[in-house]
Amino acid sequence: MSDFNKDDYLNDLPDADELANGQASPDADGADAPSDTGEQLKDDMLKDAAAEQSAGEQASEESAKAAAEATADAASDGDAEGSSLTPLGQAKKEAAEYLEALQRERAEFINYRNRTKKDMDRARQQGIIDVLTAMLPGLDDIDRIREHGEMDDSFKAVAAKIDKTFEKFGVEKFGLKGEDFDPTKHEAILHKPDPEASKATVDTVVEAGYRIGDRVIRAARVVVASPQN
């Protein structure tokens, strides 16, 4: 049996530094390989995502830049057109714009004035119609008194003033015995056969009609003499 040599045994043992650096065991290198591969894949995925994000941001910046350039070009064209005019040309252009605006305002004012006048005339006419309508029963009574000859001179003067007042405001009285019957202005309350009549005529005016211009306020209520069949 050989003698045990302490120094030789100690020299054959690996150093602590070699164990820390992984040089003592070859199996340690094989165990670290899968971990390095996973880290590499993770790094590649992060790089690809960063590249895609950068490409999207670059495309957005390019679109915004193109839109800004288009707006600037349009403004530049307008400024160029204005700057190309001489002072006299610029003054003429402004004068034409002011004239156009003035003409437009004048047309609007004329339309407003005409519309206001029509509204005032319509309101005035409606006021006359309201007064006439309220006085119709009294006017009918005056006509009945005239027909029966029971009106004295003083009352005749008052009645004449009333008639003239309505005439002043455009009120026209119509409905006379013997005139042709017109359903647009006559209201027939009775038809009386007449062997001598060749067409329908007004035989008796029960209540006179009134109109303003072409507008009939009240149709004349009449008895109509009609031809016999």
UniProtKB/Swiss-Prot annotation:
Family per similarity comment:
Belongs to the GrpE family.
Region: Disordered, residue numbers:
1-89
Report the principal subcellular site.
cytoplasm
Q: Which gene encodes it?
A: grpE
Species name: Bifidobacterium animalis subsp. lactis (strain AD011)
Q: Which domain of life is it from?
A: Bacteria
List locations, semicolon-separated: Cytoplasm
Q: What does this protein do?
A: Participates actively in the response to hyperosmotic and heat shock by preventing the aggregation of stress-denatured proteins, in association with DnaK and GrpE. It is the nucleotide exchange factor for DnaK and may function as a thermosensor. Unfolded proteins bind initially to DnaJ; upon interaction with the DnaJ-bound protein, DnaK hydrolyzes its bound ATP, resulting in the formation of a stable complex. GrpE releases ADP from DnaK; ATP binding to DnaK triggers the release of the substrate protein, thus completing the reaction cycle.
Q: For bias kind Low complexity, which ranges apply?
A: 24-36, 65-84
Q: What is this protein called?
A: Protein GrpE
Q: Which UniProt keywords are listed?
A: Chaperone, Cytoplasm, Stress response
UniProt GO cellular component terms: cytoplasm
MF terms in GO: adenyl-nucleotide exchange factor activity; protein homodimerization activity; protein-folding chaperone binding; unfolded protein binding
A biological process (GO) of this protein is:
protein folding
Q: Does the keyword Chaperone apply?
A: yes
Q: Basic and acidic residues compositional bias: what residue ranges?
A: 39-50
Q: Name one Pfam family in it.
A: GrpE
Q: How does it assemble?
A: Homodimer.
